[in-house]
Amino acid sequence: MLKTRVIPCLDVKDGRVVKGVQFLDLRDAGDPVEAAKAYDRAGADELCFLDITASHEARGILLDVVQRTAEACFMPLTVGGGVRTVEDIRALLLAGADKVSINTAAVNNPDFVAEAAEKFGAQCIVVAIDAKRVSGPGEPPRWEIFTHGGRRATGIDAVAFARTVTARGAGELLVTSMDRDGMRSGYDLGLTRAIADAVSVPVIASGGVGGLDDLVAGVAEGHASAVLAASIFHFGEATVAQAKAHMAAAGLAMRLDP
């Protein structure tokens, strides 16, 4: 049985770690390489860097952070934010990223996913799906893809899009509820489950963790293969080891460090 992965996520802006509530209101929580080393020591299964500057000028800063992290850490590293071209992906992989997450570029052109998967292999292509619930009370649940940090509606159904990009070669999906992100009220389990049940690739639940029970629910009820969290780890409310022990106690298969 595949073990459930626990993945801390570091939002990086101008080479520094920040954690915003719903992508705004940024708090400086330190140096990304130091934070990554701490998570590596703490037994994180993977680490995710999300570059929220993603401007072209800041690209070199991000590549430097990725390179220094890859040199210092053994856990797999996924990097996303501002990935628009095959060259962007190549540069991140050469800098030491294990996987690259594509967001808006995949929404604008799902064939980009196929091109990337063909060149680099599906195993290192993650598609990030940022979605909001758009169904009204009493209607069957429906979620729509939003871009630009949740500000721009696309009209694209999130579950249909998940099927599309998986068919194009995405090896993994990072599913974030924009309604829940930063709200600490738990994952949108309906969204996570709807996508996980619709595709054959691993789904990472993201957006809204307020406590360790939320991580359990992401897997047990959301059918996710991995759980991503930021605030509860960054600000010391729980350790990765505590998260894994809590999940294992709930009956989930975890990689527990000796």
Curated annotation (Swiss-Prot):
Disulfide bonds: none annotated. It comes from the Bacteria. This is Imidazole glycerol phosphate synthase subunit HisF. IGPS catalyzes the conversion of PRFAR and glutamine to IGP, AICAR and glutamate. The HisF subunit catalyzes the cyclization activity that produces IGP and AICAR from PRFAR using the ammonia provided by the HisH subunit. InterPro entries: Aldolase_TIM (IPR013785), His_biosynth (IPR006062), HisF (IPR004651), IGPS_HisA/HisF (IPR050064), RibuloseP-bd_barrel (IPR011060). Signal peptide: none annotated. Heterodimer of HisH and HisF. Keywords: Amino-acid biosynthesis, Cytoplasm, Histidine biosynthesis, Lyase.
